Amino acid sequence: AGVSYCATCDGAFFKDKTVAVIGGGDVALEDALYLANVCRRVYLIHRRNELRGTKVLQAQVFENEKITFLGESEVMEILGDKQVTGIAVHHKASDETKRIALDGVFIAVGMEPQSALYEPLMNLEHGYVPAEEDCATKRAGLYVAGDVRTKRLRQIVTAVSDGANAVCSITEYLTTNDKEGRLGKPC
């Protein structure tokens, strides 16, 4: 216990504790900022010296006294038997490995939207496809669902919800544009 992939889901379990967030993109920065409101201390660990998240989020992270950034670093080991007690972090530039005592690890890596399919069709917003809650894009008949869509929260439950909304919206679109009357009623 102590390893999580969702700061908003599990952050409350670490109230007033020390945690690490692994990653350097927007999700990692958002997680670190969220956890800084709950936890005593947050380590943000990234394999590069520069973060990849938006400049606005980077500024907020660096201004937050509860967040310590460890760049050019990789987590080599999560310590503890049944509960996380710390991590071993290797700093690439100095070639040193140190142990940090902490209570939880939040993994926020590899969360870039797979939106290349949409690039020729529309302008993306930071790599995400702009769409409202009904999952409709600005192009008639083109819908998007899941974490590739612009939205506030990216979790499995919201991706599944997007799928249901998209199906309902697509059905409505198809039946509205069904000139021959072959389709049934919309949702």
List PLM regions with ranges:
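A Rossmann-like FAD-binding core segment of flavoenzymes
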Residues: 36-133, 172-187
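Glycine-rich Rossmann-fold phosphate-binding loop(s) that bind the pyrophosphate
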Residues: 23-25
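FAD-site-proximal beta/loop scaffold in flavoenzymes
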Residues: 1-13, 107-158, 162-165, 169-172
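N-terminal Rossmann-fold NAD(P) dinucleotide-binding loop
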Residues: 28-29
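Generic hydrophobic/aromatic pocket-lining and core-packing "Φ" positions
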Residues: 32-33
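Residues that mark the start of a beta-strand
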Residues: 17-18
